[in-house]
Amino acid sequence: CITQGFITTFAGEPGTGKTSLCNILAKALGLVTDIPQRRFVDISVERGWSSHKDFIGYYNPLSKKMERSNGEVFDAFERMDSEYDCDQSRVAPFIILLDEANLSPIEHYWAAFLRNCDLASVSNRSIPLGGTQSFKLPEHLRFLATVNFDHTTEELSPRFLDRSWIIMLEPTRVDDEIDENIENAEDMVPFGAMKDAFCIREDDVIDEAIQNKWNTIQKIFRDRALQIMPRNLKMVKNYCAVGCRCMERDTPATKFAPLDYALSQKILPTINGNGENYRMLIEDLLKECTSQNMPISAKHLERMKRIAENNMGFYQFFSR
């Protein structure tokens, strides 16, 4: 998800380890070092944000100077701007975490980044700061986000869901709590190594059985007049192609693992509606995605079905 997507979102109830997982990931990549070498920045999102200038900074036309909203974040983007023209394969990734990201509408304060989510176009990716000032966005920049869902938070818009991977974390038992106290990796993992491992290659192919099941799932959506957006189709295709190369799939429960993960993290989060059409969609998907062959997707679909029965037939991935 992180290598192939510009932003990956961790969703779940408070205390499910969303922020801890982000920190563990950054440490595993060797990014949590002392400033100024540190390449992982944690931003605590605040209510009322409406622009990226609220957490980065902006050009003040009166003083003719840059005003910093957050010194650490501003310095990070300034550093990435200077790295824009360097060899992207040799530098380590730079990860920015938006913690409690939906305390404010993400599509508002992150709007400048939404148009930069297409990683196929690495030229002219930048964010404006006012006047003639801007920061260029290098290929190795990635965002993580954590979100909760209660009366204090905002819903995730279709525009955002079209661009982000969504990883739903379930509540853990006390003895399964995540240990965040791991050592930072001695060496930073180069971004080029991540691309070599997890980006699609020319010789990557999707297993025929997985492709056939994916075709069937697409038909289920078409039969219900529900569209899967072109960007999502491409993201699922690339994920499955790489997953067929990287994942072990030697048991019935893991045979369709690449598609199981891709469906649960990219397609199911877009389901949001009520009525007979959505009821039949969930029923048809459950027939195709069983607990024996696609357990992750099946679990989410069963949850959505169960909650909808007590919620006037309203089907939504994030309903709890």
Where are these regions (language model features)?
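C-terminal regulatory/interaction module of P-loop NTP-utilizing enzymes
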Residues: C1-R320
